């Protein structure tokens, strides 16, 4: 999986960047999404607040914002298009590979790690996997959806070695 990592805060250690990258690749393999592409941006609470207001109309910072990429309309082409532009099929497959982007608030991750009594590393991993599942179509609006998503989320984190005691 190709993952673009961006640290807008300048506060994320190389270890956390590498753990996030490794964990998301692990999650991608576990869910059959390893041929996809996404981005992860680490932000402050201030930036998280702005994004939450812009995309979710919620006037407060949040821990992770998941923006699933869904093309507005299908791309239609015919055989003649492929004959005229042999690179078109490859370009479209790359376009189809992009699944979305995550914005993780470093400030919220630190607050929540302390609140829940586990490590910052565990909280960062939790937020990354939670967001990853959202951009892959999982949600928790109903009890059934919540059970499915949270079970898979915990399976991934445990198999990776990031337990609540981590």
Swiss-Prot record:
One of its GO terms (cellular component) is cytoplasm. One of its GO terms (biological process) is rRNA processing. One of its GO terms (molecular function) is metalloendopeptidase activity. It is an enzyme of class 3 (hydrolase). It is found in: Cytoplasm. Binds 1 zinc ion. Its main location: cytoplasm. The keyword Zinc applies. Its EC number is 3.1.-.-. Pfam families: YbeY (PF02130). Zn(2+) binds at residues 130, 134, 140. Its cofactor is Zn(2+). It comes from the Bacteria. Keywords: Cytoplasm, Endonuclease, Hydrolase, Metal-binding, Nuclease, Ribosome biogenesis, rRNA processing, Zinc. Single strand-specific metallo-endoribonuclease involved in late-stage 70S ribosome quality control and in maturation of the 3' terminus of the 16S rRNA. Belongs to the endoribonuclease YbeY family. This is Endoribonuclease YbeY. The lineage of its organism: Bacteria, Bacillati, Bacillota, Bacilli, Lactobacillales.
């Amino acid at each position: 999986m190709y993952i673009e990592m961006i640290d807008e805060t300048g506060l994320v250690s190389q270890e956390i960047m590498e753990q996030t990258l490794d964990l998301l690749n692990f999650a991608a393999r576990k869910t059959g999404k390893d041929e996809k592409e996404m981005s992860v941006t680490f932000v402050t609470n201030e930036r998280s607040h702005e994004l939450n207001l812009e995309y979710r109309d919620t006037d407060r910072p949040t821990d992770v914002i998941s923006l699933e990429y869904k093309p507005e309309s299908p791309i239609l082409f015919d055989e003649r298009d492929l004959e005229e532009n042999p690179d078109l099929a490859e370009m479209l497959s790359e376009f189809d590979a992009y699944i979305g982007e995550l914005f993780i608030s470093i400030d919220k991750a630190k607050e929540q790690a302390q609140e829940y009594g586990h490590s910052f590393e565990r909280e960062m991993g939790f937020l990354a996997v939670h967001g990853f599942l959202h951009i892959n179509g999982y949600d928790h609006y109903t009890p059934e959806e919540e059970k499915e998503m949270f079970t898979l989320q915990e399976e991934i984190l445990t198999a990776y070695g990031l337990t609540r005691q981590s």
